[in-house]
Amino acid sequence: RHGIDLSKACVRRIMIDAGFWVPRKQRPPKVHQPRNRRACLGELVQIDGSDHAWFEDRAPACTLLVYVDDATGRLMQLLFVPTESTQAYFTATRAYVERHGKPQAFYSDKAGVFRINARENAEGRGYTQFGRALFELNIDSLCANTSQAKGRVERMNGVLQDRLVKELRLRGISSMAAANAYALTFMADFNARFAKVPRSDFDAHRP
């Protein structure tokens, strides 16, 4: 319009010199305020899959599906599977519901198991297979925009990659089947030591 032809790099440099642009490396890190815990057990359950060398060099790496109650930090469900998949979450969620009942909501990332892409949404397919199953069970499915938003399960993954790996080593456990058999014992001990008391004693799980 004004007959000025400048490269992007030149415009960026002018903006930096004028104080209108801050290079990414010089920007202060974003501070993510921790979200308050929910009040009741079963009100919100964070779920995630953690791909890791759970058996160290004794067996191939696999994925651990982790279900953490938001109000208490309790481990509610652990399942070792070959990889994160819809079928794996079906299996883990069925076991969860059979043991605890139906939570009010699951909180996950935006992986394809939980959230359809824009094209599928435009075609009118509003749910993934897993999302449809949760809808039929009357369980809300919430997706986090960032990994920090589901920080409790992310931090739990880190704890498990240290503590659970050591326990598996001590017990000579080197297979998913054996690890899944041990998971209930591990969860009971972990929760007895580290779970927090919720603000409300109401259990929000439903039959």
Locate predicted features.
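Basic, flexible linker segments flanking DNA-binding modules
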Residues: R1-A53, A118, R125-T128, A204-P207
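RNase H-like DDE/DDD metal-dependent nuclease/strand-transfer catalytic core used by mobile genetic elements
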Residues: D5, C40-L64, D70-A178
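Generic alpha-helical structural context detector
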Residues: R12-I16, R132-F135, G158, A188
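Active-site-proximal acidic segments at structured loop/helix or strand boundaries
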Residues: Q161-P207
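Short, surface-exposed recognition loops or helix-turn segments adjacent to catalytic cores
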Residues: R13, P28, A144-A149, M176-A179, ...
